[in-house]
Amino acid sequence: MDILSEVVDKTKAYLESMPKKERKKRGQFFTSRSTAEYMASLFCVSDKEKIKVLDPGAGTGILSAALVERLLAANEDISIELTCYETDEHVLPVLQEKKNFCVKLTQMP
């Protein structure tokens, strides 16, 4: 399974477990897959060996996952330092799980 699909699936599961009224109260609005892919496509991929990415409102990590996939598709040997910030403690476990998934997937031979 690709990174973005994994994050999208887990986000859907989270959305189903958290009532819309509660998400609205918390101000939770998650990026759709198509929007994340579009936003990632706007990023200029260079031939750098290392790149640092900051996601200041990471949510479940959809935007980060889309960008990581794009970067790896352009250069599978690139080193990506991803920093995610999220203040909603209800979303943090999903974000951490997906960040760990990304790390494992990118370290596979």
Residue map of PLM features:
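SAM-dependent methyltransferase catalytic region
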Residues: M1-P109
